[in-house]
C-alpha cells in the first residue's frame, strides 16, 4: 500500500470536515493516503453524495405503478409508457463550470446528461435547457449568456438531438452565478434497458470505453461543491472539455452493445470519473473491483493515480461485459473508432483496489463511498429569513396604476421587450429543433411536443420555475413551479407523467438558505403528491452564491407527459379567424412578484399568485377531457406577464387579429387586470358552436368560464377596456428585438 499518509490539514483543503476525516480513518482502519483522500473527497462532496440534501429528497413522492427505475437507482428515471416502451429522463446542472468557462461548461453539461440517458439503453429524442443569467446589458453577463448558448447549441447539434424547449430567466442575482440546467429525454424498449451495476458477476472483466483520459476536470465535483469566489476564475482546469463528435460515436457504440445483449452493466464517467463509476457499479452489484490504472488509455503523460481517479475527461464509460462477449464488445467499439480496453475485473470482497506501477494505490470499501451507503448524511439547521415577512407587507396601492389612459399600450410594449418575456428566437435559432423529424410543437412555446418514432404517441416536455416566486415564497413558489410545468404539458393535449428536478440553491450551511431549500422541497413534494406525479430523480446544486450574495432559489421542474394519439395535439395558438377566446380556471391575478412590478416599478415584492392545488388538478382534467372531444382550437398557459402578454403572443404567433373585452376578468385596477399573473388559468380557443358546451363542462369541474374575445383577420390586438389598439408590426418590434443585440455577431 502506498504510504504517503495525509494530515487533517490535507483533508480540510480537500473540502472534508474534521469529523469526516475521522470517519474515513474508522472505515479504513488507518490514515488514508493521498489517492484515497482524493477519492473520498470527490465521492463525499456535495455534488456526488448529496450529503446535505438526501434526507430532504427522501420526503419526495417516488412511487408510481409506471416507474421502472426509481430516483437514485440508475443514471436517470424511467417510466413505462405502454407498448413495451419506457421514457427515460433527467435534468442536471453545470452551473459553476459555466461561470468560469461558459462555452465548455454549458456544452459538457449537455454531454453529461445525454450520457445518463443512453447509458440506460435509451436513444435520446429531445433535450431542453433552463437558463438563468444576469442582465445582458452588462458585458460580462452578455459574454456568459452568448457563449453558454453557443456551447449548448454546438454540442447538441453535433449529436443530432432536437431541442424541444426550455426557458431563460434574467435577474441581477444571477450575474456572478449563472445557472445552466440541461434535460434530456429518451425512449427505450423495456427489454433493452441497461443498468449501472456489476450484476454480482465476480470474475467478469471491467472495460473503459470511449475517449482517452487527461487532466481536465480534476476536482470538478469538489469545485461544484463550493461557493464561487474571485479565485474561481483560476479553476478553469476543473472544467471539463467536451468533444460532441466523440460522444456521437460513443452513443452509437454503447447502444449497439446494449441492444446486442453484450453487457452486464454500464456506467457513465461523469463527476469523480473512474472513482465514481467503479464504486457505484460495485456497490449496486454488492461486489468490488480490482483496477490497474496502467492499462487506462491516457492522453497526457506522467499522470499519477490521484489524477487518473479524479479526472473527469468526457465521453468515457465503464463497462462490465458478459463473460464470453468481450471480443464482440471490443469489435463494436473499434468499428466506431473508439477505445475499449480491459482495465480490471469484478471481485467478491466489496473493495475497490487501485493499482499503478505494480503498487497498490488505494483500497476502499465500495459501499463506504456511495450515496445511500457510507457517504455522510446531514440535516442542517434552519432559520426563517426575516425578509420573507417583510416582502409580504407590500400592497399594490403602494404603486400607482400607470396603465390609465393611453399609457396601457406603452406599458405593454415595454413588458413585451423585457428579458423574461421577449422572443427567444435568437437562442432557439442556434438549436436544431428539426433533426430526427420528431418536432410537433417546437421551442419558444409553452411546452414542446415530439413524435415518438415507430409509434402514434407523442412526448410532451417542459421546464419551469419562476425564481422570483420561490424567492418571495419558497413553499408556494415551488408548488407553483410544479403546477406550471404540468400546465405547460397538458395544454399540448398530453397527460403529465413524471417529474425530474434540478434544485439550485445557495450555501446549505447558512440556516436561512437551508430553510428556503427545505420549504421548496416541501412545496414541490406536496404538489407532486396531489397531482399524482412521481419524482424520478434529478440533481441538487448548492453553493450558488458569490461575494455579492446568493441566487434566488431555483427548483427547476422538468416535466414529461404522454399523448397517446399525436393527431390529438393542441396548438398554443388558434390558426383561424372567428375563433372564440376564453380563460378557463380561476383567474386570481396578483402583482406580487410579477414581471410588470419588476419591469415598470423596479420592485420584487408582495404575495405571489394564490394557488389552489385541487383546482389545478381539475383544470388539467378539464383540458384533457375537452381535448378528447376535439373541441379546442388552442390552449395556452396564462402566467408570466398576464392576459395582455398572452393575447399579444397569440397575435404574434398566429398572425391573426383579436378583438377582446376583458369585462369578465376585470379587477379594481387596470394594471392588475392586464398584467397581474395568475395560477390555474388557461387561455383557450374554440368554435362558437362549442361555447355553451365548454362553459357547462368548465362549471361541472368547479371552475370558471371567462369569455374575452374572438380572432379576426385584422392583425391588430384590440383590448377595449384598456384603450389598446396595436398592430402586429408594433407588437413585433419590441418583442423580437429584446435579445437580438445579445447574440449579434
Curated annotation (Swiss-Prot):
Task performed by this protein: Part of the phosphoribosylformylglycinamidine synthase complex involved in the purines biosynthetic pathway. Catalyzes the ATP-dependent conversion of formylglycinamide ribonucleotide (FGAR) and glutamine to yield formylglycinamidine ribonucleotide (FGAM) and glutamate. The FGAM synthase complex is composed of three subunits. PurQ produces an ammonia molecule by converting glutamine to glutamate. PurL transfers the ammonia molecule to FGAR to form FGAM in an ATP-dependent manner.
Record's catalysed reaction(s): N(2)-formyl-N(1)-(5-phospho-beta-D-ribosyl)glycinamide + L-glutamine + ATP + H2O = 2-formamido-N(1)-(5-O-phospho-beta-D-ribosyl)acetamidine + L-glutamate + ADP + phosphate + H(+)
Binding site for Mg(2+) 1: 92, 539
Superkingdom field: Bacteria
Quaternary assembly: Monomer. Part of the FGAM synthase complex composed of 1 PurL, 1 PurQ and 2 PurS subunits.
Binding site for Mg(2+) 2: 116, 268
Any GO CC annotation of this UniProt entry: cytoplasm
The protein's name in its UniProt record: Phosphoribosylformylglycinamidine synthase subunit PurL
Protein family (similarity comment): Belongs to the FGAMS family.
GO BP annotations listed: 'de novo' IMP biosynthetic process
Pathway in which the depicted protein is active: Purine metabolism; IMP biosynthesis via de novo pathway; 5-amino-1-(5-phospho-D-ribosyl)imidazole from N(2)-formyl-N(1)-(5-phospho-D-ribosyl)glycinamide: step 1/2
Listed GO MF terms: ATP binding; magnesium ion binding; phosphoribosylformylglycinamidine synthase activity
Active site (record annotation): 47, 94 (proton acceptor)
InterPro entries: PRibForGlyAmidine_synth_PurL (IPR010074), PurL_linker (IPR041609), PurM-like_C_dom (IPR010918), PurM-like_C_sf (IPR036676), PurM-like_N (IPR016188), PurM-like_N_sf (IPR036921)
Naturally occurring in which organism (per UniProt): Leptospira interrogans serogroup Icterohaemorrhagiae serovar copenhageni (strain Fiocruz L1-130)
EC number of the protein: 6.3.5.3
Compartments in which it is found: Cytoplasm
UniProt keyword annotations, A-Z: ATP-binding, Cytoplasm, Ligase, Magnesium, Metal-binding, Nucleotide-binding, Purine biosynthesis
Amino acid at each position: 500500500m502506498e504510504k504517503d499518509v495525509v494530515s487533517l490539514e490535507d483533508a480540510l483543503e480537500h473540502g472534508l470536515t474534521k469529523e469526516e476525516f475521522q470517519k474515513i480513518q474508522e472505515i479504513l482502519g488507518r490514515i488514508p493516503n493521498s489517492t484515497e483522500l482524493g477519492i473520498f473527497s470527490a465521492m463525499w462532496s456535495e455534488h456526488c453524495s448529496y450529503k446535505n440534501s438526501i434526507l430532504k429528497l427522501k420526503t419526495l413522492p417516488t412511487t408510481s405503478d409506471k416507474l421502472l427505475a426509481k430516483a437514485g437507482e440508475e443514471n436517470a428515471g424511467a417510466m413505462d409508457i405502454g407498448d413495451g416502451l419506457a421514457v427515460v429522463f433527467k435534468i442536471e446542472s453545470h452551473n459553476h463550470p459555466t461561470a468560469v468557462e461558459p462555452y465548455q461548461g454549458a456544452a459538457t453539461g449537455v454531454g453529461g446528461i445525454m450520457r445518463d440517458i443512453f447509458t440506460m439503453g435509451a436513444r435520446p429524442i429531445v433535450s431542453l435547457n433552463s437558463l438563468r443569467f444576469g442582465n445582458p446589458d452588462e458585458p460580462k453577463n452578455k459574454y456568459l449568456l452568448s457563449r453558454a448558448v453557443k456551447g449548448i447549441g454546438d454540442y447538441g447539434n453535433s449529436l443530432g438531438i432536437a431541442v424541444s424547449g426550455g426557458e431563460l430567466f434574467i435577474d441581477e442575482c444571477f450575474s456572478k452565478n449563472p445557472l445552466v440546467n440541461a434535460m434530456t429525454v429518451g425512449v427505450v424498449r423495456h427489454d433493452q434497458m441497461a443498468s449501472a451495476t456489476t450484476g454480482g458477476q465476480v470474475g467478469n472483466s471491467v472495460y473503459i470505453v470511449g475517449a482517452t483520459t487527461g487532466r481536465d476536470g480534476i476536482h470538478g465535483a469538489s469545485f461544484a461543491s463550493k461557493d464561487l469566489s474571485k479565485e474561481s476564475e483560476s479553476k478553469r482546469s476543473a472544467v471539463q472539455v467536451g468533444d460532441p463528435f466523440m460522444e456521437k460515436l460513443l452513443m452509437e457504440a454503447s447502444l449497439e452493445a446494449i441492444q446486442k445483449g453484450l453487457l452486464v452493466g454500464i456506467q457513465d464517467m461523469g463527476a469523480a470519473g473512474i472513482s465514481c463509476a467503479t464504486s457505484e457499479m460495485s456497490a449496486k452489484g454488492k461486489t468490488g473491483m480490482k483496477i490497474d490504472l496502467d492499462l487506462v488509455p491516457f492522453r497526457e503523460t506522467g499522470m499519477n493515480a490521484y489524477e487518473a481517479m479524479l479526472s473527469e475527461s468526457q465521453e468515457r464509460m465503464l463497462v462490465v461485459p458478459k463473460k464470453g462477449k468481450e471480443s464482440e464488445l471490443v469489435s463494436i467499439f473499434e468499428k466506431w473508432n473508439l477505445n475499449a480496453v480491459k482495465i480490471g475485473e469484478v471481485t467478491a470482497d466489496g473493495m475497490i483496489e487501485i493499482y499503478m506501477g505494480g503498487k497498490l494505490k488505494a483500497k476502499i470499501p465500495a459501499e463506504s463511498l456511495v450515496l445511500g451507503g457510507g457517504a455522510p448524511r446531514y440535516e442542517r439547521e434552519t432559520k426563517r429569513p426575516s425578509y420573507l415577512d417583510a416582502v409580504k407587507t407590500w400592497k399594490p396601492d403602494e404603486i400607482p396604476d400607470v396603465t390609465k389612459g393611453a399609457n396601457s399600450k406603452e406599458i405593454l410594449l415595454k413588458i413585451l421587450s423585457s428579458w423574461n418575456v421577449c422572443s427567444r428566437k435568437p437562442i432557439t435559432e442556434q438549436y436544431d429543433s428539426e433533426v430526427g423529424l420528431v418536432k410537433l410543437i417546437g421551442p419558444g412555446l409553452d411546452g414542446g411536443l415530439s413524435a415518438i418514432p415507430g409509434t402514434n404517441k407523442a412526448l410532451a416536455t417542459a421546464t419551469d420555475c419562476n425564481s422570483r416566486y420561490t424567492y418571495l415564497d419558497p413553499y408556494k413558489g415551488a408548488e407553483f413551479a410544479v403546477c406550471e410545468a404540468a400546465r405547460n404539458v397538458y395544454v399540448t393535449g398530453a397527460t403529465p407523467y413524471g417529474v425530474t428536478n434540478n434544485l439550485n440553491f445557495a450555501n446549505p450551511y447558512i440556516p436561512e438558505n437551508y430553510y428556503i431549500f427545505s420549504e421548496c422541497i416541501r412545496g414541490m413534494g406536496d404538489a407532486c403528491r396531489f397531482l399524482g406525479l412521481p419524482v424520478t430523480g434529478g440533481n441538487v446544486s448548492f453553493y450558488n452564491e458569490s461575494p455579492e450574495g446568493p441566487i434566488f432559489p431555483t427548483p427547476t421542474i422538468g416535466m414529461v407527459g404522454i399523448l397517446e394519439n399525436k393527431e390529438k395535439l393542441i396548438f398554443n395558438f388558434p390558426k383561424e379567424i372567428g375563433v372564440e377566446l376564453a380563460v378557463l380556471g380561476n383567474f386570481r391575478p396578483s402583482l406580487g412578484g410579477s414581471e410588470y412590478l419588476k419591469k415598470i416599478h423596479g420592485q420584487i415584492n408582495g404575495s405571489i399568485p394564490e394557488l389552489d392545488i385541487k383546482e389545478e388538478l381539475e383544470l388539467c382534467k378539464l383540458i384533457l377531457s375537452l381535448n378528447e372531444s376535439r373541441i379546442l382550437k388552442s390552449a395556452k398557459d396564462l402566467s408570466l406577464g398576464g392576459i395582455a402578454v398572452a393575447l399579444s403572443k397569440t397575435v404574434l404567433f398566429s398572425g391573426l387579429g383579436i378583438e377582446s373585452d376583458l369585462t369578465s376578468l376585470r379587477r379594481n385596477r387596470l394594471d392588475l387586470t392586464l398584467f397581474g399573473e395568475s395560477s390555474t388559468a388557461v387561455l383557450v380557443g374554440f368554435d362558437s358552436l362549442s361555447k355553451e358546451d365548454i362553459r357547462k363542462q368548465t362549471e361541472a369541474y368547479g371552475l370558471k368560464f371567462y369569455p374575452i374575445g374572438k380572432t379576426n383577420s385584422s392583425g391588430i390586438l384590440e383590448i377595449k377596456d384598456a384603450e389598446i389598439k396595436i398592430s402586429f408590426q408594433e407588437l413585433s418590434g419590441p418583442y423580437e428585438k429584446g435579445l437580438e443585440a445579445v447574440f449579434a455577431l
